[in-house]
Amino acid sequence: MSSHDEASRANSAAETADAASSPVPAQDAEKRGLWNRGFVSLLLTQFFEAASDNIIKGVLTFAVAVGAPWETVFGKGGNGIVGLAFTLPFILLSAFGGRIADRSSKSRVTIVLKTISLAVAAFTAIEFARGSAWGALAALFVFAIVSAFFGPVKYGMIAELVAPSQLARANGIVNMATNVAVICGMLVAGLVSHDWKAGFIDGAPAGSSAWLPGIAMAVAVVLGFLTCLTLPRLAPQSPGLPVDLNPFSTYVTTLRFMAKGPLLAVAAAWTFFYFVAAVVLSILPDYSAFLGITDQETSYLMAGLAVAIGIGCVTAAYLDSPARRARFVPIGAGGLAIGFGLLGLAPARFAPTLGLLCATGFVAGFYIIPLQSMLQALAPDDTRGRVLGTANGLSFVLGAVGSGLYLGLRHLDMPSHRIFLVVGGLCLVVMAVTLRWLTRRSATRTAA
């Protein structure tokens, strides 16, 4: 029997099984509209997923920052260890998670993942309450594994829940909700970590404040579990797809394809943003000690940066056009270089730091949005998913490199705020490279 016949038989069996369980018919997507029950359920589930991830990561990051109770547990630059623990599962499991999402019902996979999250949330609460840094790090790692599997599930599910004409708007709404959830998670982490650290007695948290991280996590995880239960049943898209246990095979074949044209260069420039983000998010928790402020006030710095990036992205998207798209990239890189350079030299005062972070975050939108648009436009229709998935995997690789850079520079006794100078210098290099590419591109077009 041919593989085609086997696939046909598998698809027929899946269709029969799905009919019995009354899955949502794909052809009814246009009738359902954008704000249907399934999409709203997914939107809320993703919101609480992003919030819970950032609560545990935020509290742990504050706990290992300079002057914090767990500062010495992981050595200098403990924030880099936290960043690596959160990033590695995405690097290793994104492609494998995509295969699971294709061959299984995405709504069913979501419920399984959210059920696992309930158990992990209980483990997280216990480890923070008993003051175990390594236990809390292990909990973060497991949460990252769940999120790595959920990533391809949620983005694949969007196309099954809304009509093609609503897909771009749906993606925008999900991304906006994710950014809001990240900000909420960081703010909650700042509030919780302040009271949790204040309750430390003899190296361990005491009293009711010891359970604050666990309570915050439990609220977000339970709400995410409840919202996922309202997802409609969805049929597997490729039930006969083989499971490739090699997590890197898809990356290798797609990278070879991308290297044949400008896609790989665009993806490299796009992923550089996530390298920068990883370094910056490792630096900022140390500003509690550098500026002499509370964790809550430090979370305001993070929230201000996130809001500014969002505003910059919206502005860049509004001004974007194919003709000027590439020109925005060196402008954004140059703005990042100036902003980070000034942050590395700025005095230890809250207001100037917040202002510089907001300004730098705003210009970041002019760097990332044009590259995202070019990545989508250059990728062929039949390989766009793999191209964007591979680029997403690369972004986490660069994020791990960024966390490693922070860790290495801290071990060399470089003050955290001075690392901004290194990041600014790298952004200057990227600006020069993109300007050179634009010059060559213009010369080639003129010669043609």
Mark where each language-model region is.
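C-terminal ends and interior cores of transmembrane alpha-helices
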Residues: 115-131, 334-348
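Juxtamembrane intracellular "pre-TM" segments in multi-pass secondary transporters
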Residues: 21-40, 233-268, 290
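A single, central transmembrane helix in multi-pass transporters
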Residues: 43, 47-51, 55-64, 75, ...
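Helix-loop junctions on the cytosolic side of multi-pass membrane transporters
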Residues: 156, 160, 210, 217-244, ...
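C-terminal transmembrane helical hairpin of 12-TM major facilitator-type secondary transporters
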Residues: 327-368
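Transmembrane alpha-helix termini and helix-breaking/packing motifs in multi-pass membrane transporters
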Residues: 59-70, 125-130, 184-217, 290, ...
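Cytoplasmic membrane-interface "Motif A"-like loop-to-helix N-cap segments
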Residues: 103-117, 318-334, 416
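Substrate-agnostic recognition of the 12-TM MFS/MFS-like secondary transporter fold
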Residues: 40-58, 82-101, 105-120, 135-194, ...
